[in-house]
Amino acid sequence: MPHKPTWENPEIDEKELLDWIRHSVQTSSNVYSHGYQGRVYLYTGKGGRKLIIKTPTGRGLMRYVRTKMLEREFKAYSKLPPMDGIPRCIGFLDGLYLVLEFVEGVPIYKAEIKDHKFFFDSFLALIKKIHAEGVAHTDLKKKDNVLVIDGKKPCIIDFGVSVIKKKGFSPLNAYLYNTSRTFDFNAWVKLKYDGKYEEMSEEDSKYYHRMLIEEIARCIREPYLSIKIALLGRK
């Protein structure tokens, strides 16, 4: 089970923050964004320190699943030591609210990257670092999950579907973890070359391993997008 969070900033009172979160949820105020896990709120404390609070939404099974995803994300952050390119996790409040340090970054699909080679070399190194700690992200192809800081530094967010490597003998976990690692490297190649795999260098090709499950997803996605575009055009 997640451990009780500790607060690094003495200006942030746990009860005060929890009251703020509950009020924000009840009044739908201070909403920063929405995601597949639920709503994201932006808290600004004394001294201007900003925190992101991720909360589950929905009812019944959907709320349970989203809460479990937030719990998994908390476990992933807890597994990782402090490192540049990963948001600092403050804690998991009341078994519902994931509290993270706010990161001033731009999603990669919107960002202007000043030094393409430096950024993607740093991004690759960051992926290798989290893998070395036994965490695979799994969902880096979703461009919202990769931020660009100051036009040059990568930051990985949203570990809700991550896979954490277990100790000891666990064949299923080992398979899932290794598959997720492959997903991460494939995503790095896709983002670096913007999906133009024919331009991939020989050096980078060693990080790309086409997987059947990705091919199936692509086959489903392309017709779906074509239908969606056609329907939007009729409006």
Predicted segments with their positions:
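Juxta-kinase regulatory segment immediately upstream of eukaryotic protein kinase catalytic domains
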Residues: M1-V31, K228-R234
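ATP-binding glycine-rich loop module of kinase domains
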Residues: S24-S78
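Active-site beta-strand termini and strand-to-loop segments that position acidic
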Residues: L42-G48, E101-F102, I149-D150
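Conserved structural core of kinase catalytic domains
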Residues: R66-S122
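Conserved hydrophobic core/spine positions of the Hanks-type protein kinase catalytic domain
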Residues: A125-K129
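Catalytic-loop of the protein kinase fold
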Residues: A132-I149
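C-lobe/activation-segment region of protein kinase-like
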Residues: I149-K235
